[in-house]
Amino acid sequence: MARARAGALLALWVLGAAAHPQCLDFRPPFRPTQPLRLCAQYSDFGCCDEGRDAELTRRFWALASRVDAAEWAACAGYARDLLCQECSPYAAHLYDAEDPFTPLRTVPGLCQDYCLDMWHKCRGLFRHLSTDQELWALEGNLARFCRYLSLDDTDYCFPYLLVNKNLNSNLGHVVADAKGCLQLCLEEVANGLRNPVAMVHARDGTHRFFVAEQVGLVWAYLPDRSRLGKPFLNISRVVLTSPWEGDERGFLGIAFHPSFQHNRRLYVYYSVGIRSSEWIRISEFRVSEDDENAVDHSSERIILEVKEPASNHNGGQLLFGDDGYLYIFTGDGGMAGDPFGTFGNAQNKSALLGKVLRIDVDRKERGLPYGIPPDNPFVGDPAAQPEVYALGVRNMWRCSFDRGDPSSGTGRGRLFCGDVGQNKFEEVDVVERGGNYGWRAREGFECYDRSLCANTSLNDLLPIFAYPHTVGKSVTGGYVYRGCEYPNLNGLYIFGDFMSGRLMSLQENPGTGQWQYSEICMGHGQTCEFPGLINNYYPYIISFGEDEAGELYFMSTGEPSATAPRGVVYKIIDASRRAPPGKCQIQPAQVKIRSRLIPFVPKEKFIPKTRSTPRPTARAPTRAPRRGRPTAAPPAPTPRPARPTQQPGSRRGGGRRRGRLNSASRAFRDGEVRLVRPAGLSSGSGRVEVFVGGRWGTVCDDSWNISGAAVVCRQLGFAYAVRAVKRAEFGQGGSLPILLDDVRCAGWERNLLECQHNGVGTHNCEHDEDAGVVCSHQNPDL
């Protein structure tokens, strides 16, 4: 397991600004399965399927029946525009649905020019489009009417959002930050677990999932994420482990038989003490005849036991392949450098340690409690154990079979493993029948034992990817995403590192066979601001898992001890695009419940974005692959902590400014503001700068709206805030630090420091997002 405690292709993701597409159901937009008729402009990507488009079409023609022909001829286009904004990928913004403190609009937010034009030509249409009587009452006052229909965040008003490059250039793609880090989100699924080492499903149509704790308990969860109060399996009395952090012994793996629905058999992998020695044991259990959510503990049948010469490198993965055989992944026996025998256990075909084993649990032969698949690569070799499928393994921690592309089946059956390294490198391998993965001759791409490495008969397969210990020190293998809910992630191999807490990904280029590395970070700004989503996780990434539908999860903990209930299961979410409604519906088979249910209560919270403390960067060395195997190395990734940590903003001095403001003329108070503007603008317009802690700095425009502008304008002696300005419209304050970000004001505050914000100096933006205001002594509605 992991060590002791120390913290297609690129077309699918693009660099971009922090736009926030969201539908009225508070979920990401999608690509409809059929073209839309009324709202055809949203056929490629939006918030309506064919059913909703048909309903809007009915409303459109019902509206036509209530308007005379001449008016309809002039106004039909406006009617279509307004009705179809429910289908916009930014519908939640257009209708103020993303703000729980404001009522949902009945008419989308309009840009001033469009509203003025429509008011002059078709204002009578609004009485048929909206039941809002406040809007009706303003119909005779053009300025107040259009003010009422405006948005605080003018970036999202219709129709300007259609041509806003920042909102449209990355639409529907996973956005990567400036360093190429893919921005994803998480959903908490289970918590309070003691080192959750595995999450599996039974392939029986119930869509239950089972989470194993290192201490020796397995819990059953229903599709609604409630947990059964009675453990599915409890062998904690015989499992060998301890409370000390980093103990690699314990309950390590579980796999359900492919025909579990009919034979009720499952298999477990755990550490056990036998006559003062340490062993790994693979056993078969059967589910109770009386309770399908509980194992019959008396049914244990020991399949295989292997003596461990040390307490670490115990392996622990069990998998069934499409061939129906059970794959067992053992470690090399522990200690440093695989010191056992002339070549170590991993290179010794007569040893079961340091191997991938493959057995047939459905038959027995040669006096064994299992059979040997006839095509195992070393059957008939007197110097080899017939169970051996692959060798040269140090300590593969978490492996998975690729389900294959949902449409073409491409990739199905590939076996991915993360193999934990010694002193320098971690690696990801694709395991093949008879393959030699190099340990202890090689660690990653580099030689470890130079005499073995020079042996021409080694014929080892290099990893598809390796990274140095400046990036992470204990790889946790993951899965190729093949689920239904997030199409952009299809084909992406997602894995992590236990020690550094880094999430990572690999994507194969089908044309070249090369693997492209991308780090995964938690979404910035509003990326993860959807109900139920979070943007942080505990740093010790223990394992990954799939549910029955193919959605992807990982397990991590804040305290890597087998007795500490700090473990959490997270679902990986792409907030940029989802599958069309109805496509991914499941109908779980019924399960009889005989114990109490414990409802799931999430504990983790969304953390507003912050600037992360940078970690060391590194590049893994590469070598020319053998036998045509593709290689990849991380392009100097900058790690990010799992939980964002606050860092003070830059202290680059602002000094005195040329022009209108002289900051040295008097003492300033914290929270005081000033406007800096290009020549020719009125005194009420400019970039907002705020004084805090003896220095001036700028305000980032994330969450910046008219309420924040009102606070600034009132401080400066203006009666009215006309506009909240974004995107450094009044120039960039590049010589100053960014002091405030995600400022959320109600409008009554005395200064910006009294508004909600991320903390002084805590931000994740650049000066091209400097906020500004337009203030006035005159009421803009008159």
Swiss-Prot record:
InterPro entries: 6-blade_b-propeller_TolB-like, Folate_rcpt-like, Glc/Sorbosone_DH, Quinoprot_gluc/sorb_DH_b-prop, SRCR, SRCR-like_dom_sf. Residues 610-623 have a biased composition (Low complexity). Residues 604-666 are annotated as: Disordered. Disulfide bonds join 181-521, 185-528, 399-417, 484-584, 700-765, 713-775, 745-755. The lineage of its organism: Eukaryota, Metazoa, Chordata, Craniata, Vertebrata. GO terms for cellular component: extracellular region; membrane. Glycans are attached at residue 234. The keyword Acyltransferase does not apply. PROSITE patterns: SRCR_1, SRCR_2. It is found in: Secreted. Residues 632-642 have a biased composition (Pro residues). This is HHIP-like protein 1. Residues 673-776 form the SRCR domain. It comes from the Eukaryota. It comes from Homo sapiens (Human). Keywords: Disulfide bond, Glycoprotein, Secreted, Signal. Residues 1-19 form the signal peptide. Belongs to the HHIP family. GO terms for biological process: artery development; cell migration; cell population proliferation; smoothened signaling pathway. The gene is HHIPL1.
